[in-house]
Structure formats: C-alpha cells, structure tokens
From Swiss-Prot:
<keyword id="KW-0813">Transport</keyword>
<dbReference type="InterPro" id="IPR003691">
    <property type="entry name" value="FluC"/>
</dbReference>
<keyword id="KW-0997">Cell inner membrane</keyword>
<feature type="binding site">
    <location>
        <position position="79"/>
    </location>
    <ligand>
        <name>Na(+)</name>
    </ligand>
</feature>
<feature type="transmembrane region" description="Helical">
    <location>
        <begin position="2"/>
        <end position="22"/>
    </location>
</feature>
<dbReference type="GO" id="GO:1903424">
    <property type="term" value="P:fluoride transmembrane transport"/>
</dbReference>
<comment type="similarity">
    <text>Belongs to the fluoride channel Fluc/FEX (TC 1.A.43) family.</text>
</comment>
<keyword id="KW-0479">Metal-binding</keyword>
<dbReference type="Pfam" id="PF02537">
    <property type="entry name" value="CRCB"/>
</dbReference>
<dbReference type="GO" id="GO:0062054">
    <property type="term" value="F:fluoride channel activity"/>
</dbReference>
<keyword id="KW-0472">Membrane</keyword>
<keyword id="KW-1003">Cell membrane</keyword>
<dbReference type="GO" id="GO:0046872">
    <property type="term" value="F:metal ion binding"/>
</dbReference>
<keyword id="KW-0915">Sodium</keyword>
<feature type="transmembrane region" description="Helical">
    <location>
        <begin position="97"/>
        <end position="117"/>
    </location>
</feature>
<dbReference type="GO" id="GO:0140114">
    <property type="term" value="P:cellular detoxification of fluoride"/>
</dbReference>
<protein>
    <recommendedName>
        <fullName>Fluoride-specific ion channel FluC</fullName>
    </recommendedName>
</protein>
Length: 124
C-alpha cells in the first residue's frame, strides 16, 4: 500500500508541476484574457487518460503501480477534469445515460453553487 501511495504522490507531483508550467506559459505569452491555459490542460488531460486506459484495455501498462502513477497520480495532479471525463465515458460505455446526466448536471450545478457559497462566505 505504501509503495502505491508513493507512486501516486510522484505522479501527482509531476502532473501538478506540468499543469502549472503549461498553464502559466499559455496565459502569460498567448492570451491573458481567456483561460486558455486551463482549457488546454483539461483537454490534454482528457487525451492522456483516454490514451492510458486504452493501453490498459489492450493489455499494455499492466503494472498496477505504473497505472496508479499515470492515472490517479499524473492525470489527477495534471487535471481532475480528465478523471471527470473518464468517469462520464465509462457511464456512456455502460449505457447508463441516467447517471451520466445526473453526474454531469450535479457536478456543474452543485459545483457552481458551492463555489458561489464559498466566495460569498468570505466576501461579506
């Protein structure tokens, strides 16, 4: 268990640092008025987690610690949006459109409400 946690931690560190560097570079040098850096990181994270899970299903990358490093660690540190999208993709693959709609709707609606509540709490 400790070894797995270390792999996740190393992946999270790597993904988080890379997210910061990419996002900062894009925002500073390309377009400071639109959150293009975050959008780029989220889209790249979705591509990465799709690539990794595709390789897992083919039988490649079967080492459990490497899987944890890449998915929970790297992709989780890079962007949680990739995990969110992968979970939605799994619901689509399972033909579970009710839970897909519920998950997307609640994530966006409740997430925005909670952001607003948190902001309002300290803004007063």
């Amino acid at each position: 268990m400790l070894k797995t946690l270390l792999f996740i931690g190393m992946g999270s560190f790597t993904g988080g640092v890379l997210r910061y560097l990419i996002s900062r570079y894009v925002q500073n040098f390309l377009t400071p008025s639109f959150p293009l850096g975050t959008l780029l990181v989220n889209v790249l994270g979705c591509f990465a987690i799709g690539l990794f899970y595709g390789l897992f299903e083919r039988g490649n990358l079967m080492n459990p610690n490497l899987r944890m490093f890449l998915t929970v660690g790297f992709c989780g540190g890079f962007t949680t949006f990739s995990t969110f999208m992968n979970e939605n993709f799994q619901l689509i693959k399972d033909d579970n459109f009710f839970y897909l709609s519920l998950y997307v709707g609640l994530s966006l609606f409740v997430g925005f409400i909670m952001l607003y509540l948190g902001y309002s709490l300290v803004k007063q």
